[in-house]
Structure formats: structure tokens, C-alpha cells
Amino acid sequence: MLRKSAYLALLLLSFLGLAVPVANAAPKDYSAIARNIIPSGQKGTPPLDTTQAVMYDALTPLFNNVTDSDIKEYFKSEKLGTSTDGPYTTETVPKAGVTIQRDKYGVPHVTATTYDGGIWAAGWIAAEDRGLLLQQARYNARVAAIDAPGLSAIGLVAGLQNFQPSQRTEDEIAKQTDALKAAGSEGKAVLKDIDTYLTGINDYLDANSPATPDWTRNDVYAVNALKDQFLGEGGGDEARRSQFLGGLIKRLGAKKGWKVFNDLRQHTNNESPTSIDGRFAYSPIPSNKSGSVIIDPKSFKPVDVTPNTPEELSDRSSSNPLEPRHQASNTLMITKGRSATGRPLMVGGPQIGYFAPGLTYEIDMNAPGLKWRGATSAPFPGYLLIGRGQDFATTLTSASGDVIDQFAETLCGGSDTKYLYKGKCRTMGTFDAGTLNGDPVSFRTTVHGPVVGYATVKGKKVAISSKRSSYGKDVLDLMFNRRLSNGSVKGPQSFFEAASKTPQTFNSFYIDNKNVALYTSGKLPIRDKRVDPGLLTKGTGQYEWKGFLSKKGHPHGMNPKSGMMVNWNNSVARGFGAADDEWGRNGSVQRVGLLTRMLNRNKSKNGKLNMADVVSAMNAGATQDVRAIFTVPLLA
């Protein structure tokens, strides 16, 4: 029942034509079918907090028998403009040229005479519809931006905790302004949009909550980092995997221990289901592993920067070395050749955690240079996250690309706080991050990043540090979303170019009237050829990253030969190595098989699928257990 356990924005799209931009007239809508549902509701407060959830819940009992009339009944319209779902109420806003109308679901339909007016309206709506979430997230999210060891930003937000940042933390996060400026004119344009968006938030706060401190750039940077930590990262579990391997070798011997380890991690697997055609080799396992470290079994001890923090609010390493990240996003796309309508179809089910109020909310945006509708969130200054433009739609699933590596630091000078790097004994830094519920938060750092724990190698103590490729660059993700929102995306190739801008790791999907496409993003490091990507890297300086995967090297593709592009957080392409924390992602039995199985079952005699067929496949697959369908029969 994964689909029900988390927030789901379901997008149903089929396109008939190409859009020609016109000044700021009512937006031309080229969709044949465009419907969505956001179960957590628009405002997260009564009476509209459960309206959509009740609608969507009624879909589940239908299993594989969803009809066109069911789609109309249980999903609301995602058409552009105010043509459906009335009656509408008009808000009073202190901004000339901006109109906000709410439909019966509370969804705001924005009409603005200027681009900046649309961005301002998005800020006003964020403060109005997610005020509690904004206040709870703005400071707690900072632990994600600084990679505070053992702390989960989303856990602190959901647990209503109180992190108060130090000036050191504020200064560190503020450096993301430099990252935007270094990105050239596009980065500077994002920065301008952030400032306009902040004006909208703060105008609402001034009018309705004057005691609340104004929102700042750092707040936007921090909530972007929260999104990155929660959904846009992968890897960083090498210490636990390494000590697990150490245990296997101790128990089974080197040859058998390595064999079991490699069988379990399934770094690559030519029998695993994939989403696109072609091969994209990344992060191979070398035969020479001289740059890797295997620590002693059960020797890894994570640092605890906040010993008084409850376990459920932290991100401390589990005692289970095989525990995966919990992800549940799926996407089903059908090419025009396989579609009964002759146009591509998409059903997207991105899962972003079920909270009240939800992390995302909906906007229908109509301003010069901004014509979109769909899910957005506090990190996005007037930009689309998941949804549609006039003639395309987009959704995503977490890719969990390997953007985090752990390093084994050789200690020196008889100290736990001195380490060897490029032949010199260095002293670790100290990062005083602030306080959590009044208790100080402080951690050590090396040239690679925060010290996350200690372990032993053949009885000798080492420090374990963590390096994230997107550190200090979380906000660059917004360049992708800006392009989705401002008309820059005009086809698969421009979509690939846009998606390549984000350092966060996602599978991003695209559909228009002719094509379906996918691009897997992330600032993916190229490792030294002597480093096993699933193990700790020696931190002495000889085995550092050699650069990052090129845009062309990222998995991407369009219109697969099978006629179906399906993903449920599985590997997208052959040869693409799974991150060290993603054991089983490349397994031959995957839950995505439930979706393809139902799609194949629902095909008509001529091999075609309509929208009801695709929704039925999604609904049925989400209510089945992959083990019962594929594995248990083999044991009978």
C-alpha cells in the first residue's frame, strides 16, 4: 500500500497540439486530459484538508477496473485558468496587477500583468497556505544545508523541534548566494526571483503576522537543502557496508565473503528492469581497490552531536546494514505508438511524504513568461515542481544517485582530532552549528566534510567523514525549475538541458504531444579508478574525486521501443551502478514489474492502451505485494 502511505500528486496528461505563446492572454490549453489530486489538500486546514484525500481514497477498491468516469470523479481538473471547479472567490491582495481567485478546492488561480507580479503572488500564497510549515521549516531545515551529522531536517520539522542556528551556520548557508552568482545570468535571474518571492511572503506576514521575522534568502536556501536531503540524495553509507563486508570476510573468508557481498549489493545487473533503452555505464567496480578501506566488523560508531535528541527525530545510522531508503514514487508513460489516442499518455505518482499540512500545494499561474499549473513548495520562488505547462507536463521520482561518499581519515599525532592529508598532519575543524531544543550542536570537520563517526581498521582507529557533491549548491536546483516554468522547455532536448542544471539526483520525466522522455540528474562524482564506489575511500589525498559525470553521460532517453516508460524508483538504465545505500535497486525482481505486468494485461487486442488502462495499472500495482506476485510462486 505504498501509494497510500505518502503524499501523491497524480498527473494524467495527453497532448494534442503545440502552443504558440501570446502576450498575457488567457493561457491556451493544449491538453486532451489533465487531471490531478493532492490528498493533503491546498491549505492543510479544515474544511479543505481532506476533500481531495476522500476522493482519491475511493480509487483504491477499484483495483484494475478504473473507468473514464471514475477518473473524472476521483481526480480534479488540472486545466489552465478558471474554466472549471467553480464557484470562485477573489482574494484582496496589496499588489497592483495581481489577481488571486480560489476555486472550490482552495486552489489559487493567479493572473498577473507582469512576470514579477506572478513571482510575488507565489510568495504571498506560500505564506498564506503554508504559514505554519514555513515557520517550522525555516530554521530546522538549516541542519540539512550544513550536513549536521545524525540530524534529519524533515524529522525535526515533523517533530516540531526547535533548531536555532549560530552565526557560523548563517554565514555558511549565505555562501549559496555566491553559487547562484557564479552560475552566470541564469543564476542571477534566480536570485532576483528569490528576492521578489520573499517580498510576497513578507508582505503577507506584515499584514497577518507582524511579529514573525521576515523571511530571508537563507530561509529559501535552507528549505532547498531540506528537499535535497529528503529526496535528492543517494550514497553515503559506505562505513556500514564496509564493516558488513569485513564481517563476511571474517566469517566466510575473502573469496566467499566478497562473492556474497557483491551478490547482495547488485551494483549492476543485466536482468534488472530498466526505464529507458541503451546503456549508461557509471561508477564501475574496479579490480584494483587500493584506494578503498574495509573497517573491522561492528567497529563503526556514529558521532552523536545531540545526545538528547529522540531517535525518531534524528538521521542516525540504523543497526541494520541493509535497510534501504523508503521511496515510493512511480511514473507510467505510454508512447504515441502504443496509445489508443495516438498521443502519449502519462500517469505520475510522486511521493513526498504525508504531512498535515502537506509539503506541497498547488498553483495555477498565468503571468507573462509564467504559464503553468501544478505542485510547488516553499523552496520554489514562483516555479513549478511537478505539473504542466501549456503543451507539456513533468513529474519525477527519486533517483538516489551516488552523490555522497564517506572517507576513512588516517588519524595522526596521537589524537582523535588530527588526520593525515597529502602528507601533512592536519587539525580537524570545529563547526558550532547552534542549538537544538537548547542543547548545543557541534561537530568536527575535515577537508572532505563533517566527521560522522569513528571505526577501526585492523584495530587502529580512523575517523569517518562525509562528502556531498551538492553541498553548498542546493539552490542551483532552481535553475531547472525556472526553465520548466518560463517557457524554456520546448521539447525533449531542451528538457534534458534544463534537467542537467540541478545537482540533486532525480529521475525527471517529460511528455508532450509527440514524445515521452526521461533524464536522471545529479552532480555525480567520477571516482579514482582504484576506489570501489561501495566502500570507504582512503582520505589521505591520493584518491580524490576526478570531476563529475558529463550531461551526456547521465541516463536519458525518449520513446522506448517497448512503447512504455515505467519507473518505480528502480534503475533507469543498463550499466548505471547503484549507490552504496541502494542494495536491491538493480535486482531482477522489482515492484516496477507490477506496473508493467498490469499494463501488458490491460492492452487491447491491437496492443493499445487508453488513460483508464494506465490508471488501472497504477492502482492495481500499488495495492499488490511484489513478493506475493513474483517470488512466492517460485517457492511453491
Model-based region annotation:
Residues 9-17:
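Bacterial N-terminal signal peptides
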Residues 118-123, 172-192, 465-468, 479-486, ...:
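Second-shell loop/turn segments in exported
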Residues 1-9:
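Bacterial N-terminal signal peptides that target proteins for export
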Residues 382, 504-602:
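Hydrophobic alpha-helical segments
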Residues 20-25:
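Sec/Tat signal peptide C-region and signal peptidase I cleavage site
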Residues 367-381, 387-392, 396-539:
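Glycine- and hydrophobic-rich flexible loops that cap the catalytic core of alpha/beta enzyme folds
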Residues 236-311, 472-503, 509, 565, ...:
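Ordered core of a single globular domain
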Residues 26-345, 350-353, 368-370:
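Substrate-recognition/specificity elements adjacent to catalytic centers across diverse enzyme folds
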